[in-house]
């Protein structure tokens, strides 16, 4: 893969989830299949990501579109097991809200996460994932918090592994 540049796209920032793990490496590359410049991520047991903070009116713009290419599955991943939750790709949407209205347990979890990571957790999260076995469209609640939902956007070692796959989802409907 031909490296175009090592710096992140404008407005994108590293998001470190677990400081004890090696962060994912990101760079912009020219995809040899399409010739398009894309963001390439290389991770080895990482717990990090990239984020871009946006202020979007979900009633006016309820659709998100993206594409990704999955080269390999994480064989040990099982998103129905809290100790094996993992995905080779994720698109996470964070939502604002009044955290004081959440149950006390959720508030304590968010406070603890801030102590460990140095960052505030969002009020709610919708995570689009590639899952090993579950069918596309499956919604998985997080086993850690009721404020996170995972939606299977791609699944299994299907014929699309190694190929670009495009998605367009109404995230407002998906989160309900």
For the regions a language model picked out, list residue spans one by one:
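Extracellular structured ligand-interaction cores
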Residues: 51-53, 61-65, 86-91, 123-125, ...
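Trp-centered recognition loops
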Residues: 121-123, 154-169
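Short carbohydrate-recognition loop motifs
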Residues: 24-48
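Secreted extracellular polysaccharide-interacting domains
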Residues: 39-61, 73-76, 145-155
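Beta-strand acidic-aromatic groove motif in beta-rich domains, primarily in extracellular
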Residues: 74-95, 102-104
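Extracellular carbohydrate-recognition regions
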Residues: 1-20, 104-110
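Solvent-exposed strand-to-loop "edge" motifs in beta-rich extracellular domains
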Residues: 67-73, 96-98, 172
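Extracellular/luminal beta-rich ligand-recognition
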Residues: 86, 96-146
């Amino acid at each position: 893969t031909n490296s175009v540049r090592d710096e992140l796209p404008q407005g994108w920032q590293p998001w470190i989830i677990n400081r004890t793990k090696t962060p994912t490496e990101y760079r912009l590359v020219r995809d040899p299949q399409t010739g398009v410049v894309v963001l390439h991520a290389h991770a080895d047991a990482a717990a990090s990501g990239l984020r871009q903070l946006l202020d979007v009116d979900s009633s006016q713009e309820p659709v998100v579109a993206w594409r990704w290419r999955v080269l390999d599955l994480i064989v040990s991943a099982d998103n129905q097991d809290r100790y094996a939750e993992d995905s080779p790709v994720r698109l996470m949407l964070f939502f604002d809200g009044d955290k004081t209205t959440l149950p006390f347990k959720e508030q304590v979890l968010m406070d603890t996460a801030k102590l460990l990571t140095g960052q505030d957790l969002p009020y709610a999260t919708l995570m689009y994932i590639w899952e090993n076995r579950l069918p596309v469209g499956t919604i998985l609640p997080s086993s850690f918090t009721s404020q996170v939902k995972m939606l299977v956007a791609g699944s299994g070692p299907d014929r699309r592994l190694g190929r670009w796959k495009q998605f367009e989802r109404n995230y407002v409907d998906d989160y309900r």
